[in-house]
Structures are given as C-alpha cells and as structure tokens.
Curated annotation (Swiss-Prot):
Cellular component annotations (GO), alphabetically ordered: bacterial nucleoid; cytoplasm
NCBIfam families: PRK00321.1-3 (NF001462), PRK00321.1-5 (NF001464)
Primary location: cytoplasm
Protein name per UniProt: Recombination-associated protein RdgC
Alphabetically ordered keywords of this record: Cytoplasm, DNA recombination
One GO term (biological process): DNA recombination
C-alpha cells in the first residue's frame, strides 16, 4: 500500500460514493484473462487481493482500487523473423518479390496463429480517491498508464470529472527558483538529486545525483540559464521524492519511523495490516499534496 510514484488529479466538483454503489459500478468491468485472439485485457480486481473480499477498499474517506492488466508476450523480433522466413520461402518458390501489403497479411496470419499459444504476463495498477479533499492519486510513473486506469474508472462510474493536478503550474519556474535561492516552501527541504536542462532547443541536460546542490558548480549552471526539470525534495523528514516539471512525483521513499508505526500488527492479520498501511500512507500523501499545492500557491493567483 506504499505508493512509490504519483500521478495526481483533482476533482472539478465534490464527490461522494458509498461502497455498495461504487463496487456495483466496478463489477461492470471486472478483470478477466485473455482469450484466444486477445492481445490484452484490463479490469478491476480486489483491492486487497486474496486478503480482501471487496473490489474497493473504503477507509478514512479514501477509496483504494486496483486494476489488473494481462497481456500476451509476442516479441517483435520473433514475429519479424518468422515473417522474413516466410517471405524468403515465397520469393524462392514463386520467383517474385513480396510486396508490403502481402508482408502485412503474412504478419497478421502469423500473429493469429501464435496468439493462442503466447505466454501471458500480468501487472497491478493501484489508485486511491480522496473524497474529502478531491484527489485521485495513481501509483504510477507513467501518465499513459494513469490515464488508462482513469479511463476504466470513468467507464465504470459513468463520469469522472477530474483534471491533472499540476497541469496549469509552470513547475520549471518553481523548481528553478527553489534551487537558485536554495529555499523551498515551509516543510520541504532540497535533497541531493536534480536534473537541469538548457532552455534553448538543444535540450542539453545535466544530471546530478548524490550532489551538494548548493555548490558553486550548480550555481554556475543556473547562472548560464539552465532550468530545473527534476528536483529531489524531503517533506517533514517523513517522505522523500522527486518532483518533476511534468507534474509527476516519483521515487517516493518513506522514513523508517513512519513505516514502523504499524510494525506491531501481526503478519497473520494481513487484512488489518494492509488497511493500517493504506490509512498511514494515504494520509501522508494527502497531507504532502495539500502542503505542496499550498507552497505552489493558488493557480488563479498565478494567472
């Protein structure tokens, strides 16, 4: 339940769900394994897996959901090799070149033959809805994967009026200003990792890891006009993360003190442990996001 990457959205209006209605909506799009000719499937599964009984998990005005993706593994190199072998055979036997349209048809036929026999791999995608403060937080470092989950949630619920949380902020400006002045909003401290980028079309990058970001070398990069696109931050000495200029929050690392708060719960009570960890992690993330947005300021004031 400890989210490691965050793609965040805000509701455009107040929302309120009951678990009965929410789960009933999710049941319309349950996960099912791939059948013969399907490349992939995507649907809802129990939020706590084998340790839970319901699709969603409601706790502390937050809702945890889990989507499962299954896809068949057909390496492009294998397909291309089989197509090439078939093309060589046709050209040798019929003494004629094989044109692109025919190659495409051969590829489709090979795919059709191999799909039922292909290996399958699966992955889980978690997200939680904060009904109180209007957040949707997806545990992903990819906007495409986050949008895929939101699309499924929107399909199940019928509507999902959300927008990317940080889309209207020019985060380059904030990150560059924070590092230039080595000053951050209250509760946040600058870490030791950053990425800087030339403002011109060259896009030349400087990647700093485990670095003293207050040193003269970094100041020199900033003075020549480089902008900060990624910056490591420490919030309240409880959560460390990398804030990126696209609005994603990556590499979350929770303090030992925080993670040990539920250490007294027996491993045998896994459902209780998962619930306690979800409450702990989601409450920390919600507070972090609220303080981060306060530090960035009201978007209307920045217009």
């Amino acid at each position: 339940m400890w989210f490691s990457n965050l793609i965040c959205y805000r509701f455009k209006q107040d929302v309120s769900y009951t678990q009965e209605d929410f789960d009933k909506a999710l049941e319309q799009d349950l996960f099912r394994p791939c059948t013969g000719q399907e490349l992939a499937t995507f649907g809802w599964t129990k939020a706590f897996g084998k340790h839970g009984e319901t699709l969603s998990h409601f706790s502390q005005k937050s809702i945890l959901v889990c989507a499962k993706r299954e896809e068949k593994v057909l390496p492009a190199s294998v397909i291309n090799e089989l197509v090439a072998e078939k093309v060589d055979l046709i050209e040798a036997e019929e003494n004629r070149p094989v044109k692109k349209k025919e190659k495409d048809e051969l590829k489709e036929n090979i795919l059709h033959t191999l799909l039922p026999q292909a290996f399958k791999k699966s992955s889980l995608q978690f997200a939680f809805i904060d009904q109180e403060n209007g957040w949707v937080v997806v545990n992903s470092g990819s906007f495409n994967k986050a949008e895929e989950l939101l699309a499924l949630l929107r399909k199940s619920l019928g509507t999902l009026p959300v927008v990317p949380a940080f889309a209207n902020y020019d985060l380059d400006v904030f990150l560059t200003d924070w590092l230039t002045n080595f000053s951050t909003p209250e509760g946040f401290a600058i870490g030791s990792d950053a990425e800087l980028e030339e403002a011109d079309d060259s896009g030349a990058q400087v990647k700093l890891k485990g670095h003293d970001l207050s040193c003269d070398e970094v100041k020199s990069h900033l003075e020549t006009g480089k902008r900060v696109t990624k910056l490591a931050l420490d919030w309240q000495e409880r959560v460390k993360f990398m804030l990126q200029n696209d609005g994603s929050i990556k590499r979350l690392s929770y303090s030992d003190t925080l993670k040990e708060e539920n250490a007294d719960i027996p491993k045998e009570d896994m459902a209780v442990k998962l619930d306690a960890d979800f409450i702990l992690a989601s409450e920390e993330i919600k507070q972090l996001l609220e303080e981060l947005t306060q530090g960035l300021g009201d978007i209307d004031d920045l217009a």
